[in-house]
Amino acid sequence: MKTTVTKLLATVAAASTIFGMSTLPAFAAEGKSASNGNSVNISDVNATAETRALFDKLKNSGKGDLRFGQQHATDENISSSASQGDVYETTGKYPAVFGWDAGLALRGAEKPGSGADKNANAKALAQNITDADSKGAIVTLSAHWCNPGTGKDFNDTTAVASELLPGGKYSGTFNKELDAIAATAQRAKRSDGTLIPIIFRPLHENNGSWFWWGATHASASEYKELYRYIVDYLRDVKDVHNLLYAYSPGGVFNGDSTDYLATYPGDQWVDVLGYDEYDSDDSADDSSAWINTVVKDMKMVSDQASQRGKIVALTEFGRSGDRKFKESGTGDKDTKFFSELAEALAENVPSTAYMMTWANFGGGGDNFQAYTSWKGSDGEADFKAFADSNKNLMASKDNVDYSNAPAAAMQNGSARIVTPVDGNRVTDTKVVVRVKTEGVKYSDLDLNSAIVTTDRGQNVKLKYSCNGYFTGILDLNAAGINLDQSKLTLTPQVKTKDGKTLAAADGNGSVTVKLGAKPEQTVDNVEDFDSYDNEAELQSVYSPSHSTKSNLTLVDSPEDNGTKAGNIHYDFVSYPEYNGFQRSHTPKQDWSGFSKLNMFLKADGSDHKFVVQVNAGGVTFEAYPKIDGTDGHVVSLNFGDADGNGGDFAPASWDTAHAGMKLSQKLLSKVGSFALYINDNGGNRPKSGDLTLDSIKLDGKRDAYAPNTNPTPGNTAKAQSVDDFSGYSDDAAAQSAWGNRGHTEVLSLDEGPTDGSKALRFKYDFSNGGWYDVAKYLDGANWSGESVLAFQVKGDGSGNAIGLQIGTSDGKYFLASVKLDFTGWKQIEIPLVDNANLTQSWPEDANKDNPMTEDDLASIKELVFASQQWNSESDGLDSSIADIKVEPAENTSNEQTPKDESKTEVKADKEQEQSEDTSADVTAQDPATCPISDEDSKGSTGNTTVTVKPTPDTKEPADNTGKDGLSRTGSNIISAIAAVAVLLLGGCAVLIARKRKGGDIE
């Protein structure tokens, strides 16, 4: 009886949260807090019963409960016979956690996605989630989203984070990505209609600098606000209640939580505290040193999770780089790696819920990727022993038993400024201020109390709009405030009807902005350290690598000129081997008009290895100034001549793919990052010390590099064979070489067009969509001066097409198509430069559909062949390709099968078809049109927001409300409470009809 009454009261309370805002609950059953065993501190208090049960199960993990997971557990594999993945083939079991990347799958770049139809891809991904659940596996989704501002890939680090927030230039574009996530989650159901809980891990490894949401591309404040926006949008606007949200920076933190928490969005938006770390050092025979590092950091993460009532997980791990599993399957060190890691976590961090490794994508050469053992590999037996060591490691019915659902703990009401973002610049005299409330019912808010105050005495009146937002406009002109490079601090104040002021979501709730555009800095001024007001600003620009932010500080310049300098503190005890800091440049900078790099250096005499690193044209170059003295002096590092000859820079020793390359002016025209490292030189040298640097500048002016888009005749380029297939002994060898996209099951060797020659056969039935691709990694091949890509194709007369894509090292893809309206062998020659039939298909930026230029030929990453279903009545294609080569202009016929523009299927994200206005503002809608989520969150079982655990004498989940739950009691008290509910709601009841926001993918 008590349970039923509590549920109905909760329903009444939820129903009283009326009009104009979405799910902002602030209460739990009988006021239970996160510390109470009967409730969980979950980010979504309206989460489905199954989602709360999963949270509880994972949070309460103890010794023996560790689960093993893998990305693409069943749909990528190394062994050709592993139809259900290598893990299943070697162990007879599925991993307990399955992972996919929603960002890639939904745009068709990874399985189960195929093609550009996000609607179809959402259905396919949801079906895979359902299948994983039926196998006894928990599902986690990451999101390698394209850069919404440029349309380029996730590693395009053009800063965009603040423009994705409400009112931002690309908020509408980003919302489409979130809509697809919502569509996937809401379709992921069991056969009885139960929504399957999913762990969603957006914006991962943000403390690195390789993603657009990463360090130096998004400030800590921007990152936190963007993460919160993702959760708010999915949970409150899209009404998705079967997601747990994971936060997962990458290591190493040396057990210190400072940097780990620097971008933590807050407990109201996070459920899983994760950690990503890979072992890439192959010098040791065992993995103990790396495991000790992981354990030290995981203890820190576990402590933080315990304090907050959250889940702890090793969200990504594996062996990569030099330590990766070898393509041959032999010669790997420490094949007991998985058992050793699992045992260390179980013993030292028993609360770890799961550890997930990456996908067995395969491929060949340097691009080979395997993260588990496979059939026939040296580690097969040890991996099977690992899988058999504990039943909880692998999938099972119990693993996905979500019958025991605790209540959601009460959340404290809060208010925060969403825009402008703390630390950002304001360049418009009319500033739109958006304040978001969380954890409080609309009916409890004092709408007339909402204001934002400034530290100059202004009060900005806020008006409630929808989705929990208040908005107002600060008119700087009217306030007499100039855009003069000064600062302005804003503080929100929102009260409830009982006079209480909502707490700040972060710190004291204030945000400080800079007034006016950032002063332009000339390209030759690489770094003078004088533009930073404080160390936090400096540390937001430079990303630590195997160090901590606090080891980069501002000091007085050793040049004694009254200016600032930068000080790098190294600590090889805490961070062994190397410490460093990197600054990325987006867009890339053109340094080609200068011949040297100067800097003022005051070293500590340690004689360690000082590394000055420049990434130019996608290649990492290094120079090594001596630091064996202590006197301050100017260091001058030469770039060499136009071709890089005679310079001080050489490719990094670990970048074997570019060994011997010179730092030419052409490469210097595209500088993507600049970094400073101190490497441990061993011996009796000190384990800690400091370097002070200032006045890092480009010098030695010269004519800048000018691309030659029209090469002169008679260039010295020679024909290059891309692949004649003669070197492959069997199908497996050919599949390995052409495995850069997976999908190798469609490939086999065939007889070539001439006696004794070989070809690559591509036979495919369109079962995974019209576009299905294979690729060979070309490792930055230089095609400069080449005129034609030539190859032979055997047609099948199907009327379909073979699509060819040339991928460059800077992320561009150029597409041409060969229509298979013929049979037998045919010579195809595709002009490479200024060819209207070979045009940029990706990214979908301003250069889309433009032809290749000579400049694009300098570094070729991969060659792609793909099926294109041009004939809808056919059931597949069967074609072969032979003798692929590039040739200079002479002796080429310059003929190409015409491209059928009407049928070309480009593997690109068609959701990027943007109108002129790509912005959106979920805060600016009419309250009457906002989604109203004030009724019970229905989930799969009609659960309310405030359920309690089942009592020991019943097997029914305690959250089965609705008709069945109410009818079982037969008590008159239910009628009485229902009557009270009607009185409480009064005339407002008519307003509780839910209105859903349009734009869902159905």
UniProtKB/Swiss-Prot annotation:
Residue stretches of biased makeup (Basic and acidic residues): 897-913, 952-966
Localization annotation: Secreted, Cell wall
Domain GH26: 49-396
Primary location: secreted
GO CC annotation: extracellular region
MF terms in GO: cellulase activity; mannan binding; mannan endo-1,4-beta-mannosidase activity
GO biological process, one term: mannan catabolic process
Family to which the UniProt record says this protein belongs: Belongs to the glycosyl hydrolase 26 family.
Name listed for the protein in its UniProt record: Mannan endo-1,4-beta-mannosidase
Annotated source species: Bifidobacterium adolescentis (strain ATCC 15703 / DSM 20083 / NCTC 11814 / E194a)
